[in-house]
Amino acid sequence: VPHKTLNNNLRVSLLECRSAQQIRQKLYAALPAFSDIFPASKDAHILIKPNLNSNMNALTGNTTDLRLLEALLSYLRDQGYRVITIGEGTSSGFHREKINIFSRLCVDKLAKRFNAKLLDLNFAPYTHVGFEYGEKAAVARICTEADFFINLPKLKTHFEAGLSVCLKNMMGTLVGLPNKQKTHRSLFKNILNLNKFVKPHLHIVDGLIAMEGTGPSSGTPVKVDLVLIGTDPYLLDLVCAKIAGFEYKEIPYLMLAKEQGLITQEYLNFVEAFVPKEAIKPFKRPHVNMLVRFVNNPKWQYSFIKIRLSPIMNKLFSLKSFGTFLNATGLRQDVFDTQDLCLQQMCLETASCDNCKKCQAYCPVGLNLPEQLQPLHEQCIGCLYCFLVCPKKAIKIKGDLGFFKEQLKRYDAITRSIT
C-alpha cells in the first residue's frame, strides 16, 4: 500500500521490501509524499532516533536495521540536508557498563560515510517532562529542539508493554538510567506522557526482521519484510499491532490511549480497512515465568526499582556471576559482555558458495557480494549481516568474536533459516 490518508492529514505508507536494493528504491519512492513536512532549509538540524537499545544485531529482530538507516541517510543526503545527528539513549546495563552500542552495531562507521554526528542521549543536555505522581524526568533537549525529528523504531514484542514500536521507542530519549526507571511507577501512562511531550515529525518503522515472543531482547526473529511510514505514532502502532495479530486492547498503552481520546474510532476503522490480509503475520505472544511476572507487577515494581538503584545493589548487579543468575531466571534479558568483537578478516569458502546472492541482498552499504568479500572491501562496515544470512555458511570470520559469541549461540540457526 504506497500511501493512504486519514482526515486528509494523517498519512501512512506500507512498503514491502525484501532486499537492501528494494528498501532504498521504495523509500525513495515513498518519502516525496511527505515532502511538505520536511524542512525547507538544507541547513536544518535533522535528528534520527533508531532503536539501538541493545548490542544485538538487527537480524535477531532487536535493533533497527542498518539497511533502512543507510537508505534514509542516503535520501537525506541526496535531498541536500547537511546537518544530521543520530541519537540514542541505550538503557540498563549497556549504559552502566559503558558499552558503546554505536560501535558494536557499526552505526559509527555508517554515520561516518554520511558525515552524520552521533549523540548518546544519556549524556545530552536536557529538559524535563512531567510524569505521574508529580515526578519529573529528564529528556534530551535535542529531541524537542531539532528542526526535524525522525523516529526509526523496530517492530517487536515487549513482555511488559505488549509491543515496542513508535511510542515505546521514545524511552530512549530519556537521559540516563534513573530517568528511564521513573517510567515504571506508571509505565503505560508515562509512555503516553512522554509522547505528548516529545513529538517526532516523521516515523519510519523497521518491520523487516521483527521480533516475536518474549521481547524486547529474548524473543525470536520473524521475517515480515515491511517498512511503515507515517506522521502519527498512535496510528502507526495500531497498524503494527494489526500486522502482528494483536487487538489494540491487548496492548495496555494503546488501550489507555483510546481511553484518553488519543485514539478514536476513526483510527480503528482506518486500520481495519488499511492493513491487507496478506500483511498480517500473527506473532508469538510474550511469555515470562512467575518470578518475572511478580517482580514486574505494577503494584510493587517501582519499589523493587528503588531498591535496585541503591549503591549496594548497583555493585551486586555489576558482578558477572550475578548477571548470569539474572539471565538464568529471566529477570534480565540482555547479556552485558564487555569484550568487543575484533574482526580481522572475512573470507569466502568458494566450494560451499552457490552464488545465491543473499549476502548482497542484506548488505547495508550495497557491496557486490560475495565477489567483494575477498579481500575485505574498504567500504565494508563489519556489520556481519552477510555472515548471518549465508545459508551454506560459506562466509567465514577471522578474529575475536567477543560479545558476538553469545548472539551466535542463541540466534545463528534461526537467523539463517528465516532469511
Per-segment meaning from a language model:
Residues V1-C356, A361-H377, G382, F387, ...:
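N-terminal and secondary-structure boundary signal
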